[in-house]
Amino acid sequence: MASAFEMNRLAFIIFVYVIAAIPFGRCISACFGVDICTRGSGNIGATNMTRVMGLGFGSVVFMLDFLKAAAPVFLAVQCCSDVFASTVGFVAVFAHVFSVYMAFKGGKGVAPMMGVYFVLVLPVFIVAVCTWGIFFVLFRQPFISSLIACFIGAVYSYALLELYVFLPILAGTVLIFIRHTSNVREFLQAR
């Protein structure tokens, strides 16, 4: 029989999924009469919000998507192990990508992954943000910057974290790469 502690952790995981699955980009754009899913790339994330509605809206969506992972990971770090906190981070990324509120569709997962890095491994967050900035200046393609930043973040996480703490981060990174395959395909076809 499961202990009360294990049941509480399971309840917390479910709670994190329910909260992290909220598609903030879609909700905010709808408040202003815009269906973000039919504009720009059709994605609900910060990049498309910036493209369609401007930097202010994109920044708000980025922060909300960032916090949907950072806040529960912070709580998990305070009360449980880093392994559990990392698992909570993966659940937040997964919920963002496969939102129950959007028939299991969603964003690409980069903003919540940055939230995980910020709380769990701050040096990785700093390196990932700097990497994103450098490659955005070089290529002017947010998806290229995001993929390289997440890849570098995963490699650096592997160097800093214990294996069981790293594995959920690796799983989240793989998920982000899978969600960006259409971007890569379109980019290569345009060349």
UniProtKB/Swiss-Prot annotation:
Pathway: Lipid metabolism; phospholipid metabolism
Transmembrane segments: 10-30, 57-77, 84-104, 118-138, 158-178
Cell membrane keyword on record: yes
One Gene Ontology term, aspect cellular component: plasma membrane
Keywords: Cell inner membrane, Cell membrane, Lipid biosynthesis, Lipid metabolism, Membrane, Phospholipid biosynthesis, Phospholipid metabolism, Transferase, Transmembrane, Transmembrane helix
Disulfide feature: none
InterPro entries with a match to the protein in the record: G3P_acylTferase_PlsY (IPR003811)
Catalytic activity line of the entry: an acyl phosphate + sn-glycerol 3-phosphate = a 1-acyl-sn-glycero-3-phosphate + phosphate
A Pfam short name: G3P_acyltransf
Record has Transferase as a keyword: yes
Enzyme Commission no: 2.3.1.275
GO terms (BP aspect): phospholipid biosynthetic process
Membrane topology type: Multi-pass membrane protein
Domain of life from the UniProt record: Bacteria
Subcellular location: Cell inner membrane
One MF annotation (Gene Ontology) recorded for this entry: acyl-phosphate glycerol-3-phosphate acyltransferase activity
Complex and partners: Probably interacts with PlsX.
Protein function: Catalyzes the transfer of an acyl group from acyl-phosphate (acyl-PO(4)) to glycerol-3-phosphate (G3P) to form lysophosphatidic acid (LPA). This enzyme utilizes acyl-phosphate as fatty acyl donor, but not acyl-CoA or acyl-ACP.
Family matches, as PANTHER family: GLYCEROL-3-PHOSPHATE ACYLTRANSFERASE-RELATED (PTHR30309:SF0), INNER MEMBRANE PROTEIN YGIH (PTHR30309)
Similarity annotation: Belongs to the PlsY family.
Name recorded for this polypeptide: Glycerol-3-phosphate acyltransferase
Organism field: Neorickettsia sennetsu (strain ATCC VR-367 / Miyayama)
